């Protein structure tokens, strides 16, 4: 019933970073909006950013980044939002993805 009530309210967004919690926020408050704000504030094109995520609360950020990368343990919705994937955090997935990019600079 709670999910139905939240989902029925177009002004709310629900997401989760862990199976044991839920995040209910204003529809405009999400990681994608935060990334776009930060890019505008710093004068950086969002197309030049890389974001890593694994949960439903990362979906908007993965979509907003120029390069959205799903971790190996990512939930299906995060994988669908990403355009690349990497190994898990336990396997240094972020470093494994970034090192070739940094070496190419």
Model segments located where?
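Conserved acidic, metal-coordinating active-site core of Asp-based
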Residues: 1-52, 56
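Class I S-adenosyl-L-methionine
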Residues: 3-7, 36, 63, 79, ...
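A short, acidic, flexible beta-alpha connecting loop/helix-capping segment that sits on the rim
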Residues: 21, 90-92
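Short, charged, surface-exposed secondary-structure boundary motifs
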Residues: 25, 79-85, 95-98
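Well-ordered alpha-helical segments embedded in enzymatic catalytic cores
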Residues: 34-37, 93, 97
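Acidic, Mg2+-coordinating phosphoryl-transfer loop and its flanking beta/alpha structural elements
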Residues: 35, 45-89
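Generic C-terminal helix-cap and adjacent flexible tail
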Residues: 100-105
């Amino acid at each position: 019933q709670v999910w139905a009530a939240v989902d029925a309210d177009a002004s709310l967004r629900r997401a989760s970073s862990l199976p044991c919690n839920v995040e209910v926020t204003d529809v405009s408050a999400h990681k994608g909006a935060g990334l776009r704000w930060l890019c505008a504030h710093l004068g950086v094109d969002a197309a030049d950013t890389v974001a890593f995520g694994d949960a439903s609360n990362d979906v908007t950020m993965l979509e907003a980044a120029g390069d959205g990368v799903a971790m190996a343990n990512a939930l299906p919705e995060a994988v669908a939002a990403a355009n690349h994937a990497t190994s898990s955090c336990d396997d240094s997935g972020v470093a494994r993805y970034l090192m070739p990019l940094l070496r190419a600079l």
